[in-house]
Amino acid sequence: MRRPKKYESGEATQYISRRAALRKLQLSLNDFRRLCILKGVYPREPKHRRRAQKGSSEIKVLYHTKDIRFLLHESIVWTLRDYKIFAKKSNRDRAIKDFRNLKRRLALFPEIKLDHIVKERYPTFIDALKDLDDCLTLLFLFSTFPSLHLIPREQSNLCRRLTIEFLHYVIASKSLRKVFISIKGYYFQAEIKGQKVTWIVPHYYPFKPQSRQEVDFKVMSIFVEFYTIMLGFTNFRLFHGLNLAYPPQFPSSVLQDSEESLKDEASFVSDRIAALNFELLRTDKVQEDEEELDIDMELLEQDGDSKRIIKMKQEAQEVSRLRTLFKGLKFFINREVPREPLVILIRSFGGKVSWDSSIFAGSTYDEGDETITHQIVDRPSISTQYISRDYIQPQWVFDCVNQRQLLPTNKYFIGETLPPHLSPFVDSKRDSYIPPEEKALLDPSLIETHVQSDDDSEDEAQEEEETVDQELLDAQLQLAYQQETAEYKKFGGPDGVNEDEEDPEDDDDNEDDDEEEEELDEKTKRLQEEKQKMSVQSGKVHKVNKRQVHKAEVDEHRLQARMVKPRHRNLFRKLIREKQSKEKEEWLLRKKRRTIEASEKEARKTAKREARKEAAAAAAKASKLGK
């Protein structure tokens, strides 16, 4: 039997270096990177790097050998090789100035088809939805770029078209759930086919080119090349799921004959599609409001998990109310307010919206419409105001969506200091620090109900205690009266007769009195016991030695650390580091909160002092004038 050589089996054969992979595939480094991005192959980190590198100690980029074998059978490899041949022949034609042959070659430029790769990487539609977050974020970013060196204008236009189509689906399906404004952009979260899809839309600022090449636009452009094909497939499937025509089209009522539509119908339609303010054409010819079916709780409770089912039903009812949150409201967006995010929000929840026609095409009514209920303004003052509408700041729309109810508008008027904009993506169960504003907004109605019920229970307990006290007082008074009567008869009544000289009938009466006294004693004891049960006793102060408590916690932690298995020590240390970082973050947030509150308190005190000084000065001036 032949003795096996070293590094011929095990971890050494499971990994392959990037240089060896390039030799195996016969590709350049740029083509290999492009192929790996399109196929979803990425470098791996071995458990024992020295073994995986066959004894070498230098740091190399390693891939799974199975992944490289998987790339060998890909048809794109041949297309990438054809690129080299095309580049050589086209450069030769350009050098000898054979432009006729060069034109013919450019018409036969080899194109990469990625349809089969999308189907291969995402076997089911749900798999594609799970990986839609990065796709949407990157395409929304590229849709804002102008024509750059490595980003052609056609690619940016394609990203813009696909993202607008996806937003039309979100509006038509009313699947938007959460929104948030941050320094990075606008966060949106939609629920599609039971999957939560979150993406970021950047702020609408002018593009500023960077002098330093810190971002590799070439690699990002390869990702965009794959994601555009993927989102195209996804939009097609989503539109047909709602019986919407794809590509998006308008009903004949929208395309009325006008000078603008007759001049260039294609640009007219594309502008109206980008406006996100019109209903799309449906293939079923019937437009009905999709209503969720009521759940038969009697049948579902037989499963033995009624609490979970009731919670699901409550969540479904909240979502159904959220879908019609802005129904019956008409909004008007001022020219200084970002148009597209607010149009997405308002139309996703059943509202109507318009803007100045000079800003963008697709407005349906002007500012003078008397039926407008809310006008969104982001300036300190406005010259002309209507009494029939509320002038609010844009944050009101976002906060209403996150709270799933229409909030009072008095805190969002023009010139008002806005309340904190809380993130809906925070998990209250995982995060230990919760701002007081969020605690107040969690469920104020439930808090009031609890307070009211506690007051009622306290009143009832107080009434019961008063009743018991009155009964005890009556029993004690009756007992005292009986004792006084017995003593009076014992030591002499009004006739001067002693107890020893009384008749036998008096003895019988005394025995009856003794029995009554015993009954009263028992009743008094019982009432006193009941009072002791319901009465509040003064508590005792137990002094806690913080040093001993801290020492006990440290000892317990050390004992846990010693009990951890050696193979789980790294995981244990990681969990401890995460816990310490969370505690540190919570401490910093609380410290920041205290600093802000102290500064606000000092500012209020200063303002009060200034007001008093001004009032005193005004009073002194008035007194001088009076004299």
Curated annotation (Swiss-Prot):
Residues 616-627 have a biased composition (Low complexity). Pfam families: BRCT_2, Pescadillo_N. Residues 507-538, 582-625 form a coiled coil. The modification Phosphoserine is found at residues 453, 457. Residues 321-414 form the BRCT domain. The keyword Nucleus applies. InterPro entries: BRCT_dom (IPR001357), BRCT_dom_sf (IPR036420), PES (IPR010613). Residues 454-469, 497-521 have a biased composition (Acidic residues). CDD domains: BRCT_pescadillo_like (cd17709). One of its GO terms (molecular function) is RNA binding. Residues 540-549 have a biased composition (Basic residues). It comes from the Eukaryota. It is found in: Nucleus, Nucleolus; Nucleus, Nucleoplasm. Required for maturation of ribosomal RNAs and formation of the large ribosomal subunit. PANTHER family: PESCADILLO - RELATED, PESCADILLO HOMOLOG. Belongs to the pescadillo family. This is Pescadillo homolog.
